[in-house]
Amino acid sequence: MAVPKKRTSKSKKKTRKAVWTAKADKAAVEAFSRARSVLTGRSSSFYYAANNDISK
């Protein structure tokens, strides 16, 4: 079974975590921006049901 030979340094751990957190933050900002545009009615590229009667 493969086992790492040495510990990962604290700085490397922090760098990797910072990269992951930055990607997650960017995705959250983009999702929030898209949700805002849909809710305010400014979006022109999303298609969604305008009324609640979808059964027809």
UniProtKB/Swiss-Prot annotation:
Its main location: plastid. One of its GO terms (molecular function) is structural constituent of ribosome. It comes from the Eukaryota. InterPro entries: Ribosomal_bL32 (IPR002677), Ribosomal_bL32_plant/cyanobact (IPR044958), Ribosomal_zn-bd (IPR011332). It is found in: Plastid, Chloroplast. Pfam families: Ribosomal_L32p. Belongs to the bacterial ribosomal protein bL32 family. This is Large ribosomal subunit protein bL32c. It comes from Huperzia lucidula.
